[in-house]
Amino acid sequence: MEWHRITRPAARSGRAWDRSRGEPSEGEPSEDELRAPVSVLRRFTETPEQCWFCSWVGFGGTTERGAEVLLPGREYFLSYGAITDATTFENAPNLWWPKDRAWCVATEIDLLATYVGGSRDCIQALLDAEALEVFSVSVEDRVDADADTINSE
């Protein structure tokens, strides 16, 4: 189910998305939304104090500038710190992973979801976390805005 499909009437009325009402933000989880996965993921790495973070340069206004990482269609600033630093960025990191590469978190700037790759135990712990809304997906699943076949136009 895609958020823009089930909320289209509200969007057409000119009402802006509002995080204070629980509406999701594209590509940038809030500090509160990052705390729960951080608490789970820290248990599935041996290097929680050594993590890499990539933040999209297009957010603008950021003071967190580091080395640049170039991926197809996206440019990021790279920084390094503890897993708990994921919640402290001016703009939430779009990619982050520990030094031991036990898992990787990815939030595409144009989507409402965050994806995590990790061991079966790690993913199961995320699925079991009451503070998170988590669904299991496979690498073959479409994740673009038009992937919703239930609420299509």
Which ranges hold each PLM region?
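Extended, low-hydrophobicity segments enriched in charged/polar residues
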Residues: 1-87
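Generic detector of leucine side chains in alpha-helical contexts
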Residues: 34, 41, 70-71, 78, ...
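Alpha-helical oligomerization segments
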Residues: 107-153
